[in-house]
Curated annotation (Swiss-Prot):
GO terms for cellular component: plasma membrane. This is Lysophospholipid transporter LplT. The keyword Transmembrane applies. Catalyzes the facilitated diffusion of 2-acyl-glycero-3-phosphoethanolamine (2-acyl-GPE) into the cell. The keyword Amino-acid biosynthesis does not apply. It is a multi-pass membrane protein. One of its GO terms (molecular function) is lysophospholipid:sodium symporter activity. Pfam families: MFS_1. It is found in: Cell inner membrane. Keywords: Cell inner membrane, Cell membrane, Lipid transport, Membrane, Transmembrane, Transmembrane helix, Transport. Belongs to the major facilitator superfamily. LplT (TC 2.A.1.42) family. The chain crosses the membrane at residues 19-39, 53-73, 91-111, 139-159, 164-184, 195-213, 227-247, 257-277, 281-301, 304-324, 352-372, 373-393. HAMAP family: MFS_LplT.
Amino acid sequence: MSESVRTNTSIWSKGMLSVIVAQFLSAFGDNALLFATLALLKAQFYPDWSQPVLQMVFVGAYILFAPFVGQIADSFAKGRVMMVANGLKLAGAAGICLGINPFVGYTLVGIGAAAYSPAKYGILGELTTGDKLVKANGMMEASTIAAILLGSVAGGVLADWHVIAALVACALAYAGAVAANLFIPKLVAARPGQSWRLSAMTRSFFSACVVLWRNGETRFSLVGTGLFWGAGVTLRFLLVLWVPVALGITDNATPTYLNAMVAVGIVVGAGAAAKLVTLETVSRCMPAGILIGVVVAIFSLQHALLPAYALLLLIGMLGGFFVVPLNALLQERGKKSVGAGNAIAVQNLGENSAMLLMLGLYSLAVLVGVPAVAIGIGFGVLFALAIAALWIWQRRQASY
């Protein structure tokens, strides 16, 4: 394929639109499947502590395959990598529909998601460049946010009607993503012929980890984003447990509506951060991180739906304002030291490790019988203290 086809394609080309459609359907399936499978666990009388374990097996796949998925994406045509990854997601969702253990099926979806992540971002730079690339990234993020909102709500609403119907809808979304991938042009592999020795691949990946960890700015960013996304995924599961206790509502849809408010808030907060924070003033985002924990603690004490919606919207806004500058800092500094792709891969490992740790602690708290409201208050206070400690540590590092 010619270089002109690879780099000067319009963002409205068939290939680019196919990527965006595939991303929307794949992300829709991911978010709908989570809530549909949680509803299945409830219907089959799994214990409450098993709910976060479901996400832990998904996250575990990300961690296990982190050293390898970047090279896989670069060694083959990325559109085909995306298609195979969505095929794995389809197989996992279909398996759950057909009665296999939901944890086994969800693990398969996690493996597909781990392989899909570096390919979906990497292909944008192969389909377009320059200002068009910025717009393409914007389209990708917009489709992802839309999929999170619609997928989360659809999963909960459909599960209230019929759990199997909700699971079938997820499988159909993944099938649509596979079909959309077929319309992506088969581009030349970015880095073919790399060594497939597992020891060499692992050493290369962890070498990048060491480089980023030794740099004060990138270490600060890795810890901050890890804490944020670990807290975010834990909050998702806390809402499922908290809603029946605090609000007396037992359906599957209400937690998804509340989660959607967080996503809307993140969009607003991210926009504010883009205007108010630069790489030189990243520390401006830290008070927002501390306030996230404070507001989570206040939210946990609510017993009415309207203030719950308002506080979750505020949590999302604070979250978007907090995490976007940290992401930008890591991408900019990481690009110069280990390359943008390696920086993102290391960040994914850090974020998913934090998710695994926080979900494990949350599962343990539920297992020993800590009330949902108490978990929420403790979670908020600990998060605020962790971000405050990170801020103090960063200021001391900067003064040396």
